Amino acid sequence: MQLNITGHNVEITEALREFVTTKFAKLEQYFERINQVYVVLKVEKVTHISDATLHVNGGEIHASAEGQDMYAAIDGLIDKLARQLTRHKDKLKQH
């Protein structure tokens, strides 16, 4: 899985990069064929926003989450992506 992290109005520190890498590695337990991941971390005034686009076999998955801090936004994003990946995997099994 290739992981690309971009920051808008936020500095991507080594700790933040490591947190994102660890969290996204856990997504492979839901769907093992994740090819590329694009993560955009943004700060707009007081809102922290994390967006992600996953390129997987059989399609593309996108999710976005907001939080009081960047770590909370990333946790929310991972929860949304885990649900979507589970749904995507079930959809592929049915066909």
UniProtKB/Swiss-Prot annotation:
Any one Gene Ontology molecular-function term assigned to this protein's record: ribosomal small subunit binding
Domain of life: Bacteria
The keyword Zinc-finger is assigned to this record: no
Endpoints of the signal sequence: none
Induction: Induced during stationary growth phase.
CDD domains, per database record: RaiA
One Gene Ontology cellular component: cytosolic small ribosomal subunit
Keywords: Translation regulation
Cystine residue pairs: none
Keyword Nucleotidyltransferase: no
GO biological process: negative regulation of translational elongation
Protein purpose: During stationary phase, promotes and stabilizes dimerization of 70S ribosomes by the ribosome modulation factor (RMF), leading to the formation of inactive 100S ribosomes.
Family per record: Belongs to the HPF/YfiA ribosome-associated protein family. Short HPF subfamily.
Summary of subunit composition and partner proteins: Associates exclusively with 100S ribosomes, which are dimers of 70S ribosomes.
PANTHER family on file: 30S RIBOSOMAL PROTEIN
Stated name of the protein: Ribosome hibernation promoting factor
Organism: Salmonella typhimurium (strain LT2 / SGSC1412 / ATCC 700720)
Lineage of source species: Bacteria, Pseudomonadati, Pseudomonadota, Gammaproteobacteria, Enterobacterales
Gene (UniProt): hpf
